[in-house]
Amino acid sequence: FNETDEARFVLDRIQAWETAGHKRAEVAILYRSNAQSRVFEELLVQTGVPYRVYGGLRFFERAEIKDALAYLRLVASRHDDPSFERVCNVPTRGLGDRTLDTLRLHARAKGLSLWEAAHSLLSEQTLAARAANALKGFLDLIERLAADSAGLSLGEQAEQVLHGSGLLEFHRNDKIEKSDARVENLEELVNAVRNYEHDPARGLDPMSSFLAHAAREAGEAEAEAWEDRVQ
């Protein structure tokens, strides 16, 4: 009886409750930890049951999950500008706003992706030494993550990227109150990747397919306040 079985059992009870003529709004799902919301949210979306999360964010809206997905996207596609911007200085590696502004302007002027613009600026040697070293370190990190995760299973790829990027270590060493919950969320993301059922018919490699799935999950709107929804 795993977490998915548990969530399916709860969903079956909710649907039976609804079939008996009761309202979804009379149902609340309580979970033991923040990370457990992921499997419930996934099943609710899959079955078209409206829901709303109270007292927190939905799984794929959490900052640490967005950071992790950005790393996975950038490893899969170097020209993903939103992902580049999100994690080029997460965890902090000395890439300041001025360097990022220079990078954006260079990319726009040359019609390049941020990844291409970064290589271009480094080859032109126009950046200050500290900024250049930080930028090169980030580019090298992404290339290393791609090389180290090549040939691994889907779950192992996610685990490798989360460890290799320093995200897991950063949150484990963080002293803020929510650090443990963030680590649990990242570990749950690895579980989500590991358990993802890839459909080769979609024409995508397994990781790209999972990332498309995650984008759909994140894009699903929560139920409106007036809707009859599970909470």
Regions found by a protein language model. Name each.
Residues 10, 29, 68, 96, ...:
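A residue-level signal for conserved active-site and pocket-lining positions in enzyme catalytic cores
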Residues 6-13, 67, 188, 231:
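Well-ordered alpha-helical segments embedded in enzymatic catalytic cores
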Residues 1-50, 73-78, 109, 132, ...:
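Helicase P-loop NTPase motor core
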Residues 15, 19, 23, 35, ...:
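Accessory C-terminal helicase-associated subdomains
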Residues 107-120:
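A short beta-strand-loop micro-motif that forms or neighbors metal/cofactor-
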Residues 68, 85-107, 128:
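Helix-hairpin-helix
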Residues 45-49, 57-92:
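Conserved short internal alpha-helix adjacent to the catalytic or cofactor-binding core
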